[in-house]
Design a protein with these regions (language model features):
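Structural signature of eukaryotic scaffold interfaces centered on beta-propeller domains
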Residues: 12-23, 87-92, 162-173, 245-247, ...
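Long, low-complexity segments enriched in small/aliphatic residues
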Residues: 19, 136, 143, 151-154, ...
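Short coil-to-beta-strand
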Residues: 23-30
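Active-site glycine- and acidic-residue-rich loops that bind
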Residues: 4-14, 157-162
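Extracytoplasmic/lumenal domain signature
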Residues: 1-8, 42-82, 88-94, 105-155, ...
Length: 335
């Protein structure tokens, strides 16, 4: 944190709950980036890591002490949080942890020690000149590292992600993570912020544009092998995905989008097996449950959603974005 006093160290916020390993008695908690978004605005540089931000923390649930931590992107500079779900899966004799943030990089760690085990990029990114394949240490593009107040930089992906709060899901049957992604890019310039108590905020100017090579498809869904980190399949579409993925033992993956579609895909191929169009944008976290021997799928629709919804409104004006319709839909799976 450089020489910043404690009162001026902003950010490090928490988006969602972490995950608990009962055998190891550890909680894995994701932490967002430092604030304001651009290092120059907070009186720092990308070489000031802002310790524990944009990190996975392994915590003792008894006293909250940090047993280990992994700072995925020290000194984060672009409002690209690494603050989302922590998925616990055993792989290759290791007790592994998988997490992915707005950079669209899936990280694989040893959840006992925090040791780096590997990574894979799921969308186009030009933020980092290099990611060390042995350590996972990232090196920012030089113009990003050098950016001062008012200096515009152009980066992919944007603040919508990559990946955002829409959680990925694990399919034990295919040993793959099914990950919802967003494809857009960003120009960003930091504003000057008074380094006094009571100031702060995000403080940056931003513009969004289509991601090169996507043919205007903002939505992407990909299946990544948890052992090899290779892609099994991916599908792209114009509409942004706005739900977490839900997988079932019947080898289905459910996901919804801003264009009101709710679909069931084959976890092995990505093929659409069933779809329906609902009254408004499908967003939230689908759940499944059983009643009297029947299995049900429930999903919410409605408004809000943050940048994953606002950015598609700008970049896909051809898609109607309904402004009403909060509802809960329930479907019964048939044999």
């Amino acid at each position: 944190w450089g020489d910043l006093p404690l009162a001026l160290r902003g950010g490090g916020d928490s988006w969602i709950p972490g995950s608990y390993d009962a055998n190891l008695n550890l909680i894995y908690w994701p932490v967002a980036q430092a604030k304001p978004w651009v290092p120059a605005s907070r009186g720092l540089t990308v070489y000031d890591p802002a310790l524990y931000t944009n990190s996975t923390l392994a915590l003792d649930p008894g006293d909250g002490s940090i047993q280990w931590y992994r700072q995925h992107v020290p000194g984060e500079a672009l409002d690209l949080d690494e603050a989302f779900e922590q998925v616990l899966i055993n792989s290759g004799g290791r007790q592994a942890l998988y997490t992915i943030g707005k950079h669209g990089i899936l990280w694989k760690l040893d959840r006992v020690s925090g040791e780096f085990l590997g990574y894979t990029e799921t969308v186009y990114q030009n933020v980092f000149d290099r990611i060390d394949p042995k350590t996972g240490i990232v090196t920012y593009r030089q113009d990003i590292a050098d950016a001062g107040i008012g200096d515009w930089v152009s980066v992919c992906p944007s603040t919508a992600g990559g990946h955002n709060w829409h959680a990925m899901a694990y399919s034990p049957e295919s040993r793959a993570l099914i990950i919802p992604l967003s494809q857009s890019c960003l120009e960003i310039a930091g504003r000057e912020v008074a380094l006094v108590e009571g100031s702060g905020g995000s403080q940056a100017d931003r513009k969004w544009f289509e991601m090169p090579g996507t043919d205007g498809n903002l939505g992407k869904l990909t299946a990544i092998d948890v052992d090899t980190l290779e892609e099994h399949w991916s599908v792209e579409q114009r509409a942004a995905y706005m739900t977490a993925v839900l997988t079932t033992g019947g080898r289905l993956a459910f996901v919804g989008d801003v264009d009101r579609y709710f679909r069931a895909l084959d976890v092995d191929t990505g093929s659409v097996l069933w779809e329906t169009r609902l009254g408004t944008s499908v967003q939230g976290f689908p759940v499944t449950y059983g009643v009297d021997g029947d299995q049900y799928i429930s999903v919410s629709t409605g408004l809000g959603g943050g940048s994953p919804r606002r950015v598609p409104q700008l970049l896909t004006p051809d898609i109607q974005h309904p402004d009403t319709g909060n509802a809960l839909y329930v479907f019964r799976l048939t044999p």
